Amino acid sequence: MTEQKIDKRVARTKTRLKEGLADLMTRKSIQEITVKELVEYVHINRSTFYLHYSDISNMLENVKRELIEEIAEVMESYPPEPFSEESVVFMKDVFFSLGSNRKLYRSLMGKNGDPSFVQQVEDLVGEKCLTGLKRQFPNEMNMLKYSYRFCLSGCVGLIRSWLQKDPEDSETPEEMADQSFRLIMSVIRETHPRIRR
């Protein structure tokens, strides 16, 4: 068997395991999910699971790391300027990334999810935005930091609500990006009249 075929099989197996884990996490906490339950759910041998992960916790850590790396990659491709026109494009790419792994994000950010993962996402996005704010408005930071924190928490809430909807019934990533940007800018303009972008 060629290496390419093996790689595709491995990718398919990992995708099935991830989707299965996401499904099970909508029903119960990660601590309650066993390897036996997961492999039976996705119809994979237990030995196949152990080729890739040592246990459920190890799998979850790998999944979280992959998702964080994907968001970080999106963020690195944009300059840290929160109120530029590129901000909307950046937000669209973030929402596309979230949408492409919707099941996993929904599970990780849902009621049986992982609060540390939510915090990692918030910290990653927040650091990028804060860097841009400091660069653009060095003399406004004392007050901007409160607006920034308010907007960041609001965006996380917006993302969570969006992820809980069925894809067919929810807004597109473009619509969510536009809505997020408008909400952020309305808060910033209201609280900081000198910022008129």
Task: Go through the PLM ranges and name each one.
Residues 1-37, 41-197:
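Alpha-helical bundle regulatory/interaction domains
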